[in-house]
A protein has these predicted regions:
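Bacterial N-terminal signal peptides
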Residues: 10-21
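N-terminal secretory signal peptides that target proteins for export/translocation
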Residues: 1-8
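N-terminal periplasmic/intermembrane-space "pro-region" immediately following the signal or transit peptide
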Residues: 25-77, 419
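Loop-centered beta-sheet repeat module
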Residues: 208, 214-260
Length: 419
């Protein structure tokens, strides 16, 4: 702690009074002058210490950063108004700290659907928490819970960053955004515009698959008491050497039965002993941004080895259990094309209409004897508009049409922010 300015003035006054009180007893004028010089030196030293401590406190404060984002949505269904809903979809806070020029900490805390309780559907979760060590100018080591480098949305999903009130179907159903795993990862870049990431992380747990409409959503473990018998590896590569252009892809692969850990812990669950159930997911993407034009394309595909063996286990399980489990697909895929153009700008404000078409099928190939649900495949068209009164604040509106499942047709409104 350092002395406040008021306290320092009090010290000065006290010392001066003491000096003047003692003056009659000081016979030698030279001695008096020496004491005054000593006092002046001490005061100067005290002032310098105060400045130094204040500077250190200011630096320490700037090393810690806080940010966040949030979004609210309204969905109005064309054929069934009873499904209409308004939702405080997400409230997120970022907290980061830089320990020194090489070592930093990053975290992301998220609240979904406003209220989290036993009776409500809201969730509270740690979306990211990791340490990053920069041991070379263009190379980093990441350890902890972090986002997988897949597609456009998974690492950059703040509302002002993407088009549309809802996140696109392909990067929700095929790529399970927001997808994070615990582990260790390396990343680097070159002066020619190449950027790469690779690492070893926790994998999927196929015993937790609970939704055939999004095969990987329930089975990625989020580092919540994650089974770690079967780890996975990932890699991503992106080229950004041409201004405005991004071309890249990513791969993730690992066994998913986790040594049959779920059955070993509870024999009331499916028994996948002797089955590996490797899940492999890959994607390719490209983006071109030039002046007011923004074009995007993405293709993603997943494969589950041993899906036939696992589904036969699930068939026997479902025949004897009161709780039916969905069957795993051998393959699933999705693709999207998107175009946006900013038609008006004034100061910080802008208006950008966009159009997106996408196709997905979460059960494109099923093992022999197991049928696919038509509700899990569709062609979706989205036409919408984003108005930004500030680059970090957005109001959105769009129309969505589902060709094969028209009951999902809807009109959406939304707002979002980031800081």
């Amino acid at each position: 702690m350092y002395l406040s300015v008021t306290r320092m003035h009090s010290v000065v006054l006290l010392l001066c009074c003491s000096l003047f009180a003692a003056a009659p007893a000081i016979a030698d004028e030279a001695e008096l002058k020496s004491q005054i010089d000593t006092l002046r030196s001490q005061l100067n030293l005290l002032a310098e210490q105060q400045k130094s401590l204040a500077a250190q406190a200011a630096k320490a404060e700037s090393d810690t950063s806080i940010g966040g984002y949030g979004e609210i949505s309204y969905n109005n269904y064309r054929n069934d108004s009873s499904r209409n809903q308004a939702d405080l979809k997400r409230f997120v806070l970022f907290v980061g700290h830089r320990f020194n020029d090489q070592l930093s900490f990053n975290s992301e805390l998220e609240w979904e659907h406003a209220v989290a309780s036993a009776e409500d559907k809201g969730e509270t979760e740690v979306e990211q928490m990791y340490l990053n060590y920069q041991f070379a100018n263009e190379m980093n080591l990441k350890t902890g819970l972090f986002l997988m480098p897949f597609g456009f949305l998974n690492q950059s999903h703040e509302p002002p960053v993407f088009y549309g009130v809802e996140r696109n179907e392909v990067e929700t159903r095929i790529i399970p955004s927001t997808w994070r795993e615990g582990g260790i990862g390396l990343s680097g870049s070159s002066e020619k515009g190449m950027a790469w990431e690779a690492g070893i992380v926790t994998g999927f747990d196929s015993a937790k698959l609970d939704d055939a409409s999004s095969p990987l959503a329930g089975s990625h473990q989020e580092l919540q008491l994650a089974r770690a018998h079967d780890l996975a590896f990932y890699g991503a590569l992106n080229y950004r050497g041409t201004p405005g252009l991004t071309v890249g892809g990513a791969l993730f692969s690992g066994n998913s039965t986790q040594g049959n850990a779920d059955y070993r812990a509870d024999t009331g669950k499916p028994d996948f002993s002797g089955i590996n159930g490797r899940i492999t997911l890959w994607e390719l993407h490209t983006r071109w941004q030039k002046n007011d034009l923004d074009l995007q394309a993405l293709y993603a595909k997943g494969k589950v080895s041993d899906a036939d063996k696992m589904d036969n286990v699930l068939l026997n399980f479902n025949n004897t259990s009161t709780t039916a489990r969905p069957y795993l697909p051998s393959e699933f895929y999705g693709w999207l094309l998107q175009a946006a153009y900013t038609v008006w700008r004034q100061g910080d404000m802008s208006v950008t209409p966009f159009m997106r078409i996408e196709t997905f099928n979460t059960q494109s190939v099923m093992p022999a004897g197991f049928g696919a649900d038509p509700a899990n495949a569709d062609h979706v068209s989205t036409l919408g508009l984003s108005f930004k009164p500030h680059p970090q604040v957005v109001y959105k509106a769009d129309l969505q049409r589902y060709r094969d499942n028209p009951d999902n047709d809807r009109f959406n409104l939304g707002l979002g922010y980031m800081f």
